[in-house]
Amino acid sequence: MNTLPVLCATLSLLCSGVFNWDFEYTNRQEFIGGIKDYAVAYNSHLQDFHRVPLELTLVQALHESGADGNSRFAKEGNNFFGIKALNDEEYMLSLDNSGAKVRIFTRKCDSVIAYTDLLNESYHYEDFRNERLRQYIEDEVDIEKLIETLSVYAEDKKYIFKLKDMAYTLRKEGIIENGK
């Protein structure tokens, strides 16, 4: 994949000088608002077919960060998506004895950017990109179908079910649209 559009989007945000790189939250609504702001701002600098749907970003952020941003990874590492550390990236260890190294981000927005870049660049998410492109061409957004492409995101065999359940909950609460 050509990473130039993603790099250009990141540089554009960095140079804009008007973006709030960090946000404080004390409740679920503030957490959701911060994630939305970052996702919308970053996506606005990407070509349409490189954007990760806001609904999907919210579903994964809320699932991975304990539904309200209060997971240890979110609070101590600004990591809202359970993104693993690679090579020499700063990390914290998972407390579940798995030895998983979870990446630490300096700023909260960096987690949203890394999540978007991960889905756009990693070979693990080629199915996601293909489905997103198909939906883009057909002018549709089906979060359920996109979720089904993310089985490699976590080792949990019930991960897809849990994401779909989170999407259902967020739809019921009026936080995300139907996605179809």
Language-model features and meaning:
Residues 2-59, 63-180:
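Catalytic cores of secreted/periplasmic lytic hydrolases that degrade extracellular macromolecules
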